[in-house]
């Protein structure tokens, strides 16, 4: 089985899952080529699992304009069984090559179907995304195959690395600093919780605004901006609570990653978490934008060790039962082998 991926993402949960899947497929004997942007920090994580070719994805770059022709020529030469595009914009560049099964993998809600004119099958990582694709009028094949993450526990980072007292309650969140991630709401929540520290991993266009908000609310001494981290697991293992504060989150890989490290989760009632989280059982859920609600939920977990343990254990059970590496990899292998 030979698969050629084209993935033009930058850094984030979708990219971490891409790395996980490429490695899992390689372990099961799939020969892979990955076309990615230059300079990706996660390139080294797939170097042993796939041949890597780099291509620019800027809208007006010559590489982007020529990419469909390059992929088609490469496909004729190397004869992959499957071409797999990750996300709508990569799907738009899918060549009209008849010799391979053409798959588009979606981790978010598409706005139109014209991206997928040369796609045979759309893989959606939640039922909600699949429903959107169907509602838009898609008549070809749809599969729902979700994500997985590594479940191995790691050694927690020393809190002193982020200038945080060893005995302080610590809350963490991570992702690109954009408005929809809701980090401003989380900072407002922490301002209501004296003594609680907040670690934010990531970066982005809202960075300066978030720094200013922390200063304006008088909590800059308790908020740590840690930037992008190659491995977030030691940080997840070191904190008391992980908070997913997004107003829009199709799945929520960060929740799965938190459960893998035994960390309880508080999440907004956004799309993905509402699918697999059960309020009060495997996590606590809060309305979008409700800083006071986040503060109450965080305080509950910090103050109640038995609740913290129970939420973490039930979360890990959900991870293993619904998002296992073996089951997700099996589902992809079954799909890849179903080439018409």
Curated annotation (Swiss-Prot):
EC numbers: 2.4.-.-
GO biological process: lipopolysaccharide core region biosynthetic process
Keywords, in A-Z order: Glycosyltransferase, Lipopolysaccharide biosynthesis, Transferase
Coiled coil region boundaries: none
Organism: Rhizobium meliloti (strain 1021) (Ensifer meliloti)
Family: Belongs to the glycosyltransferase group 1 family. Glycosyltransferase 4 subfamily.
Gene3D superfamilies in alphabetical order: Glycogen Phosphorylase B
CDD domains, A to Z: GT4_GT28_WabH-like
Name of the protein described by the UniProt record: Lipopolysaccharide core biosynthesis glycosyltransferase LpsE
Leading EC class: transferase
Keyword Glycosyltransferase: yes
Gene Ontology terms, MF aspect: glycosyltransferase activity
